[in-house]
Every structure is written in C-alpha cells, then in structure tokens.
Amino acid sequence: MSSDMAADESEAPVLSEDEVWEFCLDKTEDGGGSPGSDVTDTCEPPCGCWELNPNSLEEEHVLFTADPYLELHNDDTRVVRVKVIAGIGLAKKDILGASDPYVRVTLYDPMSGILTSVQTKTIKKSLNPKWNEEILFRVLPQRHRILFEVFDENRLTRDDFLGQVDVPLYPLPTENPRMERPYTFKDFVLHPRSHKSRVKGYLRLKMTYLPKNGSEDENADQAEELEPGWVVLDQPDAATHLPHPPEPSPLPPGWEERQDVLGRTYYVNHESRRTQWKRPSPDDDLTDEDNDDMQLQAQRAFTTRRQISEDVDGPDNRESPENWEIVREDENTEYSGQAVQSPPSGHIDVQTHLAEEFNTRLAVCGNPATSQPVTSSNHSSRGGSLQTCIFEEQPTLPVLLPTSSGLPPGWEEKQDDRGRSYYVDHNSKTTTWSKPTMQDDPRSKIPAHLRGKTDSNDLGPLPPGWEERTHTDGRVFFINHNIKKTQWEDPRLQNVAITGPAVPYSRDYKRKYEFFRRKLKKQTDIPNKFEMKLRRANILEDSYRRIMGVKRADLLKARLWIEFDGEKGLDYGGVAREWFFLISKEMFNPYYGLFEYSATDNYTLQINPNSGLCNEDHLSYFKFIGRVAGMAVYHGKLLDGFFIRPFYKMMLQKLITLHDMESVDSEYYSSLRWILENDPTELDLRFIIDEELFGQTHQHELKTGGSEIVVTNKNKKEYIYLVIQWRFVNRIQKQMAAFKEGFFELIPQDLIKIFDENELELLMCGLGDVDVNDWREHTKYKNGYSMNHQVIHWFWKAVWMMDSEKRIRLLQFVTGTSRVPMNGFAELYGSNGPQSFTVEQWGTPDKLPRAHTCFNRLDLPPYESFDELWDKLQMAIENTQGFDGVD
C-alpha cells in the first residue's frame, strides 16, 4: 500500500457508544439544548445531530436517525462508522470534460422508507475521486440498510447516475484495537439501478460498529463477510488489486458484447445481424431454423420497400427503363387449389414481379427457411421465359402476395388470350371477372384535398353490421354488431379505397424522382451487362474484388448480371435485388468496424471514426461502399441500411446544425443548447474535447491553443460550431471523402442536389409500408391526451388518410428516420433505450406541432377541428428545416 493511501486510511481511535453519546450531550449543552435530554429530541432528519470526527475531534457528520422504532428498542441499537474513501474507475458521463463525482449516503428502513441522508463533497474532474469522509449513524442492524449512490454533478442538466451499492448492516464487524490487523476497507462493485444504466468501477468503503458499552471484546471473532450476492475484496496490502465480479455465463456462438457511444451495453448477433439489450444465455441460443426465419423476415421487410413510382403508375403506362426488366410469366404457372387457366398479362406490375421473383429465387436457391417443394421446368436461354415453379400450398405472408396497382392487397389484374381482364384473388386462390367492389367507389379517385371538408357522409355507408351512435357528451361512436363491440374510430377510415389517394405531396418527391431518372445518362459505349460470379459465404470479399477491380466506373452502369456459385437461376432483377440486400447486410455490419450504431438506437448507422484501427484498407472499402450505393441508385435498387441525418447532409454538402444533433446524441444536444441559451463563462469550458479511446481519455483542441481559450458569451457560437464539426465532420472526413468519391463516379453530384436529406434517404433506402394499426397500438399519451380524446381521434384519422410517402415523412419528422424496426413499433428506440412513440398535449391551437426525435415524441396542440389539425400537421411535416418548433 502506498504511503499516501496509508495516510488517508489510517485507523481512528476506538470510541465506545457511551463516549459518543457523552460527547453529543456536551455539545447539546454548548449548543443550547437542555442537559441530559435525549439527543434525538433535538434532531430533525435528514439533518445530523452534531458533528464529530473521532480521529481529531474536528467537525464531521454524525447522524442519528429519528426512527421511532429506536426508542422502543434502544438496547438493540448500534452506532455504525461509515467511511467513504474513494471511487475507482468510474464511468465518464460528462461530455464536456471529466466527471465531477459525489456520493449520496442514505440510511433507510425497507419497511418505512428513508430515515436520513447525507452527501459528500464533489471532487472535480476525476474518475478516481478520493473523499475520505466519515459518517456515524445510530441504527438497528437487523432492520436498517445503507444505500450509497454515486452521481456526476452536472450544471447543464440533471446529475448523471454513476452506480449504487446497497449494504445490509447486520454482518458488519465491531472495531477491536487488540486485533493485529485492524478491519480495513472493501471495494464494492457499483451496480446499475435499471437495464438502461451505464455504470462501471468500484466504491471503496469502510464500515464498522463502535464497541457497545465500552466492551472491546464484543464480536471480536465476528466474520467480516457481507451477505451473499455482494462482490467485495479485502485488500490490506494491495490497493491497486481490484476485485473481479463473478464471470457471467459465456455468450452463445455468434454473439458479441459491445458498448455504444453512450456506454450502454448491448449484444450483437452476427449471424442474424440483430442486437438486443438483454444478455443472451446459451439456453437462448437460436437454432439454424430460427436464424433462417429471421433472415427471411428481414428479406421480406427489405422486399416491401420500393421507390416512389412503383405503386402509383398503372401497368399500362409504365415505362420500361433499363433498370426494370419486364418479365412474362409462363402460362403454366399453377396454384394448388385452383389453377388460373389463362395467359398472363402483357405487362406485370413491378412490385408484383419483384415479389414473385424474390420468392422464386428463394425457392430455387433451396433456402432452408422455405419449406415448399419446388419443381422447375427447363429453360433454353437467359432471354427465355421465367422458369415454372409449382409450389405446395403453404401459409404466405400477405406482404409478399402479388398486388396490382389500385387493387386491394393480394388482388392481381390479368388478361386472357382475348385481351379480357380478369382478377386473381391470391388470398383465396380464386378468380373473377368482376373488379373488386371496394374499388368501385368513384371518390377513391379524387385526392383528399379536393373532396372538400371531411364529413362522415363523404365516406359512404358503414360496413355491414355496423351502426353509428352519439354519446351523451356529443361524441360519435360506432357499434360492431357482428362481434358486439364498440369503438370511437370510424371503421370506414381503414378502407384503403376510400382514404387511399390522399393529398399529393407538395414537395413532389415523385416528380423529382422522375426528373432524376430521366437525367441519368445511359452509357452507349459499355457492354450490355456487368457480370459478377459470387460465393454466398464470401459475398463481401468477392464483391469488393470484382467492383474495385473495375478501373472505369461507367462499366458498373451496365445491366447487372449476378450468379451465385453452385446455383442456377435467371437474373431478371430479382437476384440483383437480393444481392443488394445481402451486400448491405455485410457492409454495414458493425462487426467489420466500418460503421457503428448511432447513440439514439440500434438500427441507424454512422461512420466509425476509428475505422482505420479495425481495417488498414478502410478508405478503399469506403470507396467500394460508395460505388455500391451509387449502383443501387443508378439501377433503381435499394440499400438495406439507414444512416443518421448528418450523413445525408454531408452527401449533399449541406451545413450540419445543432438541430441535427438531437436525433443523434441527445446529451450533446442538451448541453450545447444550454450553452447557447445561457452564459457559459462560469463553467470554465475550454475549446477542447475529451475523447475516450480504448479506455484512455485524450484531449483534442478544437482550434489552435484551444486549451487556453475560455468559452464565453461572445465566442460560444463558434465553440458550438466547432463541436458539431468535430462530432460529425472532422473525425470522419477521410472516410466520407472516400465514400463520396465512389458514389459520385456513378451519380452526378449536381443532380443529387435536387433532393433534401429526407428525400435522399428515400432514394437510397426506399419507402416502406407503415402499419398504422401497429403504430397506434404502441403509442403513449401524455398531459391530458388519451386514446379516446377527440384530438387523438383526429390525429389517427389524418394518419390513415395519408399516402405511403406522407406517412414515411411523418415517421421521419417524429423519429428522425424512415426505418421501422423489424418487429414493429414495439421496438422503437430513443436516446435512452426503448422509447415508444408518444403524443403529448402542448401549446395552443395557433401553434404548429413540434417533434422531439430523440424521445420519439410529438407535441400536438389541442386543435378545434380536424381540418385545422390536418393543415397544421401538413405544414409542420413539409417545413421541418425552417421550423423553430422542432428541437
């Protein structure tokens, strides 16, 4: 033990409880109390009675609880000496510098609650603070416990939690000066108080009872062990030797434990590319079949994402650019149960073709998650018809059923050899000459903004078995006599035919997209196709070598022709789409160290600033990823990866603002926002940033001589600008430059600037289907709103009346990304872990709605009509950038 440590932890002279009481009574007389009176009568918790330091008789905390139970059991009470010595290896929580830790010591009774509490002094800028403060408590050993909570003092926001230790008092030893080795300190492992807490390190404590009635022999042989479950270490000689907590069970194969940029521990399943907060156990290890099911689920979710033009053009007027191949279905395609004995239509809806081709590809490849037996007919050439597959009837997810534009899900329009149109219901495997009746309502062809004021009479008749009634308070509700239930929502609002073609989007992303497609130049001096022969097990390495081996990037604009080793199949677009899904899964996997999850959730990505430490050729890989992204945009395909908003802004060479930081790192945002709105001079901040790398803290100057420049009211805007530049731009400048170099080899930089950052995400990742019912089911309400509130009814009515793009825009507005978690809105994440979508009543009707992307919260004023809510919500979504209400 070092000399300074020994000096800090020198043993105090032993005082009996009677001596302590005598001293307190003397102090009572000096302080004006009545001689001989009970000390507890003059004490008011949580304050201490009098102050005493048994080492030097200088003032120090001596606390006696005012628990009435003590008076009845005075013979059972003891005085415990608690010494808070030090903290070791605490977590760093202060983003503007080292932590400022202090300890709150609370004596409590599990039955009656807190008895008294005291706080140590704050040690500035230290992760290994030394307090050396003593406290005396009068306690009932069998009833009372002491809770030690460590916090990081923060002037900008609330104090950060660094860990806690809860110690029972009955097993503590009694001080005995005759012992050759006096009782020494113990290091307690700091524990979290919830799964969201990020803690590490130890709290060094010394806890002993004073001898009772002057008896030095009492409990001399008492064991010094605490109750089972606490990890401690008795270390009289080696202060640097730390205890090790019990080894947790090993992770299942393919799993890895990591910490995000906020220090939160999460677990990565590299086989399924999934993450979770809960530590998996070997018993939770997924079978191959389970992994295949999740893989197929991810593929299905990826397949349903589309470009804006894929679901709005009819089959008759659809253009056939090079990136979309029109495929004729073979006449002999059969469905078990009832075959459709008629030729296919001359044009197949693109979304329908992609779904069929993707399913066919999975079946041909023998995907273990696909259990249908497949029989394939021979084909003579690559340009021939699609191979015929006969599938045994299996449950099929509706999302993959072929669907023609303008028809209900699962319905497809076809033509026979005479050119007559008929309709296939893939849900029931039946055909009919009649167009589905739910589409016959002519109102479905009128945009919602041209229908005039929304009225129940405009929605047509109620479905069979439904009745509309008026409640005593004037609100309208609906009765479903079929199942004998009532609800507030109008069932007609869920009729896609009535609410389908909603308000055309004023930003007109569709027109931008079509203009963009027309301006992309088709190369005439390149081969007809670009072939890639790949191995599934080495798809990243094979793709990297093939694409980076091309010196002239224009060759990548040729039609993609992809073959997987050992598989026979035709690539009419489906295999290329599958390749983009698989290569995205590999490129963006944090396992390779090129990307990492953002601070907000575990499904949006950002470039890893330390990627060079993981891969020496990281810049070459970023150029490769840029080329792949450019190929996806050029060929009209999609990437399975969603990035933070500043990433898209950097691609567009737009300035990143403080607002962009909120959805990425809420702690940084809150701190910088406070600095912007207040005078930071008293904080003694400098133009430096502390960065932790592999457990060591490094200082980075934001400008030359920054360590000597104090942040004041005059230069705080410059400080905030430099922090944002460092956080998003400077640290990844080389990686981003390599990515853009590869991307702009295929896509003209000036042409991409017609989009904003939200539209660029849709261009690269596509539009997904938002399940409004799932969204609504996993929504919380605050500050007066509830599921049955009239404004909430109007809000969900508005969401149901939106088209797919507008719903995605609303999702981007409130969460910062167009990505819905694979398992739905139940797994939506915010800055502090799982965070459900929340609608909170706020403001007055003259205000626009505002969003808090780090909390997935929408502040919605109490509007007085549906039309007012509709107009204000549209305005807020479309004018996010210049809208002060969004923070």
UniProtKB/Swiss-Prot annotation:
Membrane topology: Peripheral membrane protein
Effect of gene knockout: Lethal during late gestation. Embryos show a retarded development and defects in vasculogenesis and angiogenesis.
Effect of C854S: Loss of ubiquitin-ligase activity. No effect on VEGFR-2/KDFR degradation
Pfam name, any one: HECT
Role this protein plays: E3 ubiquitin-protein ligase which accepts ubiquitin from an E2 ubiquitin-conjugating enzyme in the form of a thioester and then directly transfers the ubiquitin to targeted substrates. Specifically ubiquitinates 'Lys-63' in target proteins. Monoubiquitinates IGF1R at multiple sites, thus leading to receptor internalization and degradation in lysosomes. Ubiquitinates FGFR1, leading to receptor internalization and degradation in lysosomes. Involved in ubiquitination of ERBB4 intracellular domain E4ICD1.
Subcellular compartments: Cytoplasm; Nucleus; Cell membrane
Activity regulation as described: Activated by NDFIP1- and NDFIP2-binding.
Crosslink site: Glycyl lysine isopeptide (Lys-Gly) (interchain with G-Cter in ubiquitin): K847
Subunit organization: Interacts with NDFIP1 and NDFIP2; this interaction activates the E3 ubiquitin-protein ligase and may induce its recruitment to exosomes. Interacts with UBE2D2. Binds, in vitro, through the WW2 and WW3 domains, to neural isoforms of ENAH that contain the PPSY motif. Interacts with BEAN1, LITAF, RNF11, WBP1, WBP2, PMEPAI and PRRG2. Interacts with murine leukemia virus Gag polyprotein (via PPXY motif). Interacts (via C2 domain) with GRB10 (via SH2 domain). Interacts with ERBB4.
SMART domains associated with the record: C2 (SM00239), HECTc (SM00119), WW (SM00456)
Protein name: E3 ubiquitin-protein ligase NEDD4
